[in-house]
């Protein structure tokens, strides 16, 4: 199972007493700010959670898996995430819930 933005909004609604509309808007604004920062080439550091970084990948040779033909894979910018030590520790020590 995956955590969705809708579930995050519902959690904020229940825990903070926000209206459903405000909870949804808060989640959307958070992710929009992360997107905006990354689009502007900024690193996003969330203390106790992790860092979102941009990495430029160079063009490299690739292969079409169907035909075996050599093709170039174009240079591109990708988003990477590096979890912080607190998040790593909590995940390592967590017991997954059964569905």
UniProtKB/Swiss-Prot annotation:
Q: By its UniProt entry, which Pfam families does this protein fall under?
A: Bac_DNA_binding (PF00216)
- Residue span of region Disordered: 49-71
PROSITE patterns the UniProt entry points to: HISTONE_LIKE
Q: Which UniProt keywords apply?
A: DNA recombination, DNA-binding, Transcription, Transcription regulation, Translation regulation
The secretion signal range is none
Name the NCBIfam families on file: himA, PRK00285.1
Q: Which family does it belong to?
A: Belongs to the bacterial histone-like protein family.
Q: What is this protein called?
A: Integration host factor subunit alpha
- Species per Swiss-Prot/TrEMBL record: Erwinia tasmaniensis (strain DSM 17950 / CFBP 7177 / CIP 109463 / NCPPB 4357 / Et1/99)
């Amino acid at each position: 199972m995956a955590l969705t933005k809708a579930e995050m909004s519902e959690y904020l609604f229940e825990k903070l007493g926000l209206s459903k509309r405000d909870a949804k808007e808060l989640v959307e604004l958070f992710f929009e700010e992360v997107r905006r920062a990354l689009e502007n080439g900024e690193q996003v550091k969330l203390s106790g959670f992790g860092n979102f970084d941009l990495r430029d990948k160079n063009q490299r040779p690739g292969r079409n898996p169907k035909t075996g033909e050599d093709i170039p894979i174009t240079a591109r910018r990708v988003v990477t995430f590096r979890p912080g030590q607190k998040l790593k520790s909590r995940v390592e020590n967590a017991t997954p819930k059964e569905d």
